[in-house]
Every structure is written in C-alpha cells, then in structure tokens.
Amino acid sequence: MDLFDFFRDWDLEQQCHYEQDRSALKKREWERRNQEVQQEEDLFSSGFDLFGEPYKVAEYTNKGDALANRVQNTLGSYDEMKDLLSNHSSQNHLVGIPKNSAPQTPISKSEASFYPEQKNRMIPSHQETTHSSTPMPPPSVVILNSTLIHSNRKSKSEWPRDSHNTSPAQASQTSSQPNKMQTSTQDPPQTRLEDFFVYPAEQPQIGTVEKSNPSSKEENNPNSGGEDTFKEIFQSNSPEESEFTVQAPGSPLVASSLLAPSSGLSVPTFPPGLYCKTSMGQQKPTAYVRPMDGQDQATDISPTLKPSIEFENSFGNLSFGSLLDGKPSAVSSKTKLPKFTILQTSEVSLTSDPSCVEEILRESQHLTPGFTLQKWSDPSSRASTKMLEDDLKLSSDEDDLEPVKTLTTQCTANELYQAVEKAKPKNNPVNPLLATPQSTPATQTNVGSGSSSESESSSESDSDTESSTTDSESNEAPRVATPEPEPPSTNKWQLDKWLNKVTSQNKSFICGQNETPTETISLPPPIIQPVEVQVKVKPNPSQAVAVPKERPLLSLIREKARPRPTQKTPETKALKHKLSTSVDTVSQRTIGKKQPKKVEKNTSFEEFTWPKPNITNSTPKEKGSVELPDPPRSRNKATAHKPVPRKEPRPHVPLATEKKKYRGPGKIVPKSREFIETDSSTSDSNTDQEETLQIKVLPPCITSKSKETSNASLTLSTLTNGNSNNLSTSNEETAFSPPPAMQTELLSPLRDHENPKNLWVKIDLDLLSRVPGQNSVPVTPAKTDYKETASKPKRQTAATAVEKPAPKGKRKHKPAETAEKIPEKKQRLEDNTTICLLPPCISPAPPHKPPSTRENSSRRANRKKEEKLFPPALSPLAEDPPRRRNVSGNNGHFGQDKNISMAGQITSSKPKRSEGKFCATFKGISINEGDAPKKAASATVTVANMALATATATATVPAIVTATVTATATTTATATTTTTTTTISSITPTITSGLMDSSHLEMTSWAALPLLSSSSANVRRPKLTFDDSVHNADFYMQEAKKLKHKADALFEKFGKAVNYADAALSFTECGNAMERDPLEAKSPYTMYSETVELLRYAMRLKNFASPLASDGDKKLAVLCYRCLSLLYLRMFKLKKDHAMKYSRSLMEYFKQNASKVTQIPSPWVGNGKNTPSPVSLNNVSPINSVGNCNNGPVTIPQRIHHMAASHVNITSNVLRGYEHWDMADKLTRDNKEFFGDLDTLMGPLTQHSSMTNLVRYVRQGLCWLRIDAHLL
C-alpha cells in the first residue's frame, strides 16, 4: 500500500462522502476496491510482506511474561493465523482493511469506528484491563460506538461468518467491507485515519462525549479526530501502524475474532491486513454494556462474543490512532501493560472537566471548520466524519441506543456537534467519568483506574483536540506526511510500538490514577477525583493544549519517545500520586519543556497533596533530627549528619537529577519543593543537628551541651562554666563569650544556608577566610582534660567523643562499643565524603602515644590526679607559646596522652564524621579550654565544611578566645609541655578541667601537640588522634575492606594509591590483632604477606622513581617502603623459629652428606682439570647423574628441598626488609622537612618499631599527604 494508493482511495472516500447515496456508492466502491485488492493482493502480500512471520509473537510468548501471554492471546496462534493469512479471501479481508476507512458504507463507517473498537478489542487482549480504565472516558463515545459497534459487531460478526456477505444489509456491508478491507490494504492509512478521526474525536470527546456521545463523537471525529488521528498516526509513527493495527485484528482473527481484535494492535506483524472484516465481524460490538472481563473475552474467538464494554468503549471510543498513541486505550493498556511503561506524554490532557470537555468540543468544533478545512482537503477527515455518521446510522439501525442512532443518523457532523453540545449541558454537570459509568457500569468497575484514565484520556483528547486545533495547520502537513510512516508499519511490528506506547501510558495512567486519588483525596471515587483534578487542572490542560499547539509533529513523536523516559516516572509515582492526576498527565502529555509550567500551575494544588507526603517525609526526617539530639551523640552525628547530606544533594543538584529521573518537571518541581519544604524544616532541625553534630565534632562536652540546648549555638557560658572547672572560669567564660557570638553567627548563617549545604559550607569558608588573620594567632594549648583522658580508655574516649553530649563521667565510662558504633557511622560519613579514609580504630588511637597505651593511660590517670591538685599553677605554666602553636595551623593542641586520648576520642569520632576535612583527628579544632567549646563549635562547623576551614576556623576561634583562654590554657599548657608527655598531660588536666569538659580540648589535641612540646611546637601540620582501644581482627578487616573498596572506586591514581596504603595499614592492624588472638583461624603471617602485596600494588600505581614523580609520590613511596620493611621484618620474626629449625636441619643434612660428597669424584674434576670434561658434564646431567654410580651427584631428598626453599623464603624477608628500609632512607632525603615533622610529631620510626607505631606513623603521614593533595 503506497501513499499514492492511499490518497487515491482517500479521494474516493471523499467522493463517497459527498455522494448522498453513500451506501450504494460505498458498496460500489467496495466492490471496485475488492477487485483491485484481489488484483494487487498477491503483489501486496508478497511485495510488502507486512508481517513476515510472527517472530514478535514468538518473542513475546517465549518470554513467558504476562505481556507475552497477552500478546499471545491477542495475536492468537500463528499456526491458526497462517491459514487465514494464506487464504486470499481472508487476506482480502486482512489486507484490504485500509480501504475500509474512506468509501465504506455506513457499516464501513461504523466499521471505521468499530475498527478502532476492534482494534481496541484486539488490543484489549493485552490491554483489556489496561483499557478498561480507558473505556470509561468515552462513555458517550462508547454509546455511539456501542450503537455503531453493536451494529458493526453484528455486521462484523456476520462478516466473519459470511466473510463478505451475510445479511442483505450486512452483505452489502460485508461485501463492501471486504472490499473496503481489501482496498484498505491499499489504503490502510485511510482506515487508520478515519479510525483516528473517529476515535481521536472520540478521545477528545471522551470527556465530552460522555456528555453528548453521538454528536460529540461524530463532531469530534472530523475535528480533533482528524488532528488526533494525525497526531496519533504520527505518534504511532505511521498510518500503517494504525492500519496494521486495524488490519491485524481482522486477518488472523478469523479463528480468533477477539484475539484478532486484541491482536489488532499486536497482530500487525501478519502480512495480510490483520484488521479484517472477519475479525471485525467476530468482534461483534456488544460489550459496551459489559465490563471488561479481561483477555479471555478478547481472546475468545466466537464472533458472537462481545468484547467487554470497556474494550469497546475504550477502543471503540478511542480512535485507533489514539490507541496507537496509547491515549485513552493506551492509558487503559497502561494498567494492563505496566512492563512497557512508556508514559505517553501526549496522553496527558489535564482537563476532563465537563466545562473542559465542552471547551474541547467547542475547540474541536472550531477545529472542525479550521481543521476540517484542512481535513476536508484530506478526504479521510471528511470520510471519518461522514463515515461516522454512516456508522452512527448503521449503529442506530442495529444498535440499542436509538437516541444516539437518531442523532447520528439525522445529524451531520455539525448537527452532531450541536447535539453533542446539547447533550453536554446535560452531561457536563456530571463528571465524564460518571457519564461513563452510566453508559457502562462495567466501565465503572474499571473506573478506579478507568476514571482517572478516562479523565486523562478525555482531558488528553481535549488537550489533543485543542492542540490539534492549534496544531491542525502545523500538523496538517505532517499528517500528509503521516502516510510515510507506513514503511515502518510494514517493516516494523506495530504491536511492539503500540504496546510500548500503551505501557508507557499505562504507567502514566496508573500513576495518574494513583495521583488522582491522592489529589482528590476528598473524593473517594476515582471518577469524582478525576473530575476535580480536571477542574483544578483545567488551566493546565490549556497549557498542555498550548504546548501541543506549539509543538510540531516531531514534538508529538518526541512525546512518544518521552513516554519511555516517563517510564522512569514509576519511581516518581509517589510524587505523581501527590500531584493531581491531571498534573501528572499534563506533565506526561506536555513536552518536558512545558510540563514545568503546568506543574507550576498545579504546584499549589500539588503542594496541597505534597504537604502530606512531605509531612510524612519531613516528619520522619524532622523526627530523626529532633530525635537525633536525644539519642547518644554518636547517633546524632551519624543520623543527623547523614540526613543532612541527603537533603543537601536533593535541593541542589539532585533536583536536576530528580528532574532527569522524573521526567515530569511538575513532578520534579513538587518534589523539589517537597524536599525544600521538608528540608527547610528538617534542615532547620538538621542545621541545628548539624551544628550540634559539628559541636559534637568539637569536644564531646560541647556537643553534649549543644545538643542539650538542641541549638547549634550552645550555651557556651554554661559549657564554659561546666567545662572550665579548674581553669579560671572568668577567663574561659570571657573566651567563651566571644566564641558564642561567633558560633551563633556561624551557626545562624549555616542554618540559613543549611538547605543548600554547599552554600553552608561556603559560608563557613567565608567565615574562615575572615578568620585567616586570626589564624596567625596560635590556639591555646590542647585542652583535653587530663582526668578525662586518663580515666577514659581510648575506646571510651572515642565513644565519649562520639557521645560528646554526654558528661565527662559518662564519656569516660561510655562503653567502647559506642565509640566503635560512632566510628562506623563516621566512617560511613567518610565514605560519603571520601575524605579521611582512616578506619575508626585509627582515628581513636593517638599516634603520639607510646606503644604502651596502658602505661600512657596510667600516666594520664596520675596526671589527672596531679592536675586536679595543681590546675591553677599549671594554667599559668601553660603559657608556653609553643604549645599554643597550631600543629597544622589548626588550633588543636596535643595534650599528648590525655589530650591525645581525648582528642583521639573526639577526633576519632570527628574524623570519621568529618574525615572529609582532615583525617579523623585532623579536623579536631583545638580551642582554648573555656573557649574550646565555643570555638570548637564554630570551628568544628567550619571544619565540617572544609579541612582548610578547620585550620582557619581553629585559628579564627582561638583568635577570638585566644587572648583569654590562650593566656590561661596556653600558658599552662606550654609550661607543662616543656616536659614531655607527662608535663603536657599535667598541663592538659588544668586546661582540660575546663576545656576537656567541653571536649574541645580533645579537638584541640588533634592539633597535634607532640609528645615533646618543644619539638611538636615546630610541627605546623594537623595531628591525628588514635584510639588505643583494642579491637578484634574482624573489626580491622572490615575497616580495611572499606578503605580498599574506596580505593577501588577511585580513578585518580595518587588518591587510589593513598587509599590502598591506608587499607594496607588496616590489614596490618588486622594481622596484629591476629597475633594477639591465638584463636584466629588465619595466620597473621598470611595477612602480612597479603598486605605486602597490596602495598606493592599501590606503589606500582605511581612511578616514584620517574624524574617526573612529584614530591607526593616520593613521600608516599617512603611511607610504603617503611611499611614494607617493617612488614618483611615482622614476617621474618613470625617465621624465625621455623627458619631456625630449617637451618639446623639443613646444616645437619649437609654435615652428614659432606663426607659422601667428598668421596664421590666431582664431575668438574673428572679429567683432572678445573673445567669439566665433556664426559663429566654428561655425567652431571640430570638424566645421567642419578644413575651414575661412579660420578652420580648426591640426590637431595624432597624434604630437604622444601626446607631449603622455606628457609630461603623466610630469610629473604630480612633482606627485603633492610633493602626497602634503605630505599626509604634515600627517598627521605628529598623531603626531610616532611618526614622531620612526622618524626617530631609521631616519634621516629625504626626497624624495631611495633606494628601499632608503624600504623600510626604511616597513617599520620598519609593524612598529611591527603591534605597536601587536597584529597580530604
């Protein structure tokens, strides 16, 4: 069927329409066409082979999914179809269908409308359930269709029976129809177009047709029908699609009429016009009264079996084009074919409102003149109208709905329109959905889905009509071009396209249905809800209509494509439910560009819905935020911090992503609003939480207090009073007073900007940028309470740090589990931030502490006691400026053991939380005792924002408080720090008494006061605090795996290498734990061996030996070499006993065999010369040597061989260890300052250092490398 034939037939149809004796002329034309078709049948079927073999059917059925079953039911068995396809007579029916569109007798008209119904029916097999919802929209149309369809069904059912002629009327009809169908093969587009015109009109009318079924339908057929038809055709990609769909039902349906109709959409694969009269006859239009029972009826072959009303309604009412477009029928099919969830944006017309329907009908009427002019130029449009009239007449003759008959029989398209308008006022008050139920109670059964789909389809048809009116001109040419899509129909299986469209529509429709109840919550019945939604959304439909007007046919095609993108909308179904159905449909229907507008209009309406979901969403979030302060600080940090990141991304970038995800901008907008609202509320609480969390990141005391106050701004005075027990409260308070202002200032802006956390971070940076001048001011010495540090185990300190809100005593006694939990949470945060990869165990352990942390803790306890006794004197002593100095420019001061332990606790929790900033403890911002809480809070917030920010923030906060607290705390700290850790610890207690309570001291301690205050004073880099708590091997293994997975996910080689090295440290800790626990199943030697391999792999990522290698690469190489060296030495120590045994055994063996060896003449001296003779060489050969009695070499037992190999492997570890150590020494020369600071801060690393010291030393170095490389 080429375009020429199509238009030629179209012209014939037009002439027929102009003929007054249409039935006679149509009959003649049918006969003529039948003859032509018969002549062209062979060529057509062979040349075009429209459907080849039903590979699609097999494909779908093989999948075994519901859709495949539906398709199978729809298409029927191909074997059954073969006969029909092979028969010329059946092929005539199937192939000639396209001609049905134009010159058909009134029966053909009813057929035209019926074809869509059949198509619908055929579609129903898959889509019955899906279309069931759709049928409701066109109840009036259904009535018209029902009349037409009943008549058509009768005639059609008889057609299948008679195949051509059945009853006199039907005989002519059938004869004409076979001809028509045959000719339709030639002119499939015409039938499609007519069907489109009929159903598109019906679709737009669906809302209105319910009100005035016959007239509106007939009227809309020429108007919106034509446009919709074209749109649908375009959407269907070609008239042929519709043709195929039309034909598909007919041809194979001889055996399975309903299947054929259902296969009408799917059957297009069959070469002959599947939409044959026979199938149409089989699809006797009886089911308008019946609810869609499902595919069973559709698949039922008996021609008498009437498809469910919904099928006929949805399909009969819908133009096949609409079916192709997946509009109403697609909507219904959506329900049924969720898999192919291709939401059809075109399907979404917001207004199914009675008034909207009236407007649509009017527009369609207006379209009828304008569009009809265009379409009248297009014979198919006229044919569709007049055919509709004829169909109506036929249906009136045969159908039970006589009022409609009378209207359709007596009324011209204009008259029908007037009648429709008359009917409209009657039905308009009633929801179109209600009208639909009236026409079809069964439809109401599907009304739940159908009502929304109906409203969508009606509104869609309305918008389509409007858009067609506006786009009629623009679309007119495309319609002409529409036939061009035929090749795709011939080449491409139309059922596939249609199903995709329908499925997309189904999803959108389903979403729409859900949304409709959501929006019109007050209206329980989906029908009523759609009406309200439609009414509310009216403006939106107009917008939607406007959009279609503006958009070209390409846009329509795009819309088709969009439905697929909208498939993503299932994810946003919740949002859709929140949005009004109309809104959702509008967004679907409208192209992405204009959807936002519609959404905007609906947003207020949506917001009404949104608040509920938002309330739900926000409520949990807010609850979480509210609860977060209440639960242990560790929880608050993790939970509060986590929710915040979620919210942040959503309002910022995620909104765009969400838009992408949720194609519907409307959906996106409400969602974004929802998030904004929930985020604004939750963000407020989250900001508070975050602030409190940040405060938490600060000393535990501060966080605890801040949480208690549940405001980011803590009552610093209270904190100061509580925290500065030993320090002069006045000084600390004085220091605190400024920090509170800063804190409040920082916090308030943070709160303001918390919704966009990026902004919040930036704000902190700005604050830090202000502070830089203050950064020069060193922060007061570390302020961890010596008592707390000493009393608290490292684990407990970490736990307390996590629980910062808890009091000192509580923190001290908090179980290590809390600390572990907190580190894990923090690590999760770290995973998010991917800043500090330090495992929680690492952060808790202060690197500077001696390997014997127990001794340190005992010392700390003693120091605490001493500090308790001498806090005042110590405070003045702490004046030493070196202690004030920020190790990393951060104010954190290391209270050595106490401060470190506290800092380890706080920082361990903080780093995990804000590892993104500095490595765990790195972000600890040392704040002077009393000031520490306030400063720490503000500084911590800044630190949370940025690692650099932390440095500045610490400097800034101290700058404010430094005068007071620095004078006190720093003086005491420095004085005490003159001594080693003990002095520092004593100083720390004094400062800590006030400062540690605020747990800011811990934060400051991360600032890395070295064991030797004088040496550490020179260090300007941040110091990590490490947890001395002991964990089992599994704990370290999990940490190592996390770090390794992070490294695996990275693409930047340096960052990957650093993370692998960090993971290797955790594996090393795991091996060390295995050594401690004899019950561990895995050998620590194996763990170390695997760790060595990981380190070697990490070193291969960067070629440090290259002249282009950066200092960072060389520094990393040094750290890796140190690790490798100590690991090799450790491996040797683990196997040293075995090596000694092997050595003894080997020595004994060689001694025993020494005499034998001397007795045996050596092959090398067989000829009396130093060089072996050829004979001796031969003797030495492995083959001959063993069997040679005289000169045979001594055979070495396998046992000795293995012992020697093992001995070599073990001893080689020593060689490798020293070799790598030497390499590290060489590379260290290029970065003396870096490693000098590292040695100063962490203590020199030697070949005899413990694995714990190694891990802390290297981890501290890796932290600095991250900072230098901006990886934190």
From Swiss-Prot:
Q: What is its main location?
A: nucleus
Q: Which residues are annotated as modified residue Phosphoserine in the UniProt record?
A: S395
Bias class Basic residues marks the residues at 634-644
What is any one GO biological process for this UniProt entry?
nuclear speck organization
Could you tell me which residues carry Phosphothreonine? T482
Stored PANTHER family:
AF4/FMR2 FAMILY MEMBER, AF4_FMR2 FAMILY MEMBER 2
Q: Which family does it belong to?
A: Belongs to the AF4 family.
Q: What is the name attached to this protein's record? A: AF4/FMR2 family member 2
Q: Which organism is it from?
A: Mus musculus
Quote the gene name from the UniProt entry: Aff2
